[in-house]
């Protein structure tokens, strides 16, 4: 056991996943934070001590809503509140965010899933891909 009593192979798998995604994205981020952002609850249940993305998803959801609201508000000064709300809802919908994860980030192969979720194709589930973007 290492880092917070997580199995060494799980830590290694997470680090390899984070490093591969950082390289693919051509960016630098805190690797431990990226591992957390890519860790599904099912993986953390099988690897006690592993943090999953749920808290980051909570924060990311609020940030996405704020940024999309401000962007739409400034970009469309003639639209009313209802029109802006519809545009924002579409921009931050599961469909839109999972498409970004699938087609732009190619995030599926990097998501750390528990065995059962992985066997059920969790890396391609829209709900999980959406959570990763949030």
Which residues does each predicted region cover?
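RNase III-family endoribonuclease catalytic core
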Residues: 2-133
């Amino acid at each position: 056991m290492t880092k917070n009593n997580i199995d060494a192979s799980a830590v290694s798998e997470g680090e390899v996943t984070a490093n591969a995604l950082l390289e693919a994205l051509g960016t630098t981020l805190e690797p431990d934070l990226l591992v957390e952002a890519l860790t599904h609850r099912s993986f953390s249940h099988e690897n006690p001590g592993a943090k999953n993305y749920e808290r980051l998803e909570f924060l990311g959801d609020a940030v996405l809503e704020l940024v999309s609201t401000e962007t739409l508000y400034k970009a469309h000064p003639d639209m009313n509140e209802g029109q802006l709300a519809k545009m924002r809802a579409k921009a931050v919908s599961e469909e839109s965010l999972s498409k970004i994860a699938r087609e732009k980030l190619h995030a599926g192969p990097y998501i750390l899933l528990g065995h059962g979720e992985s066997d059920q194709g969790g890396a391609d589930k829209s709900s999980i891909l959406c959570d990763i973007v949030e």
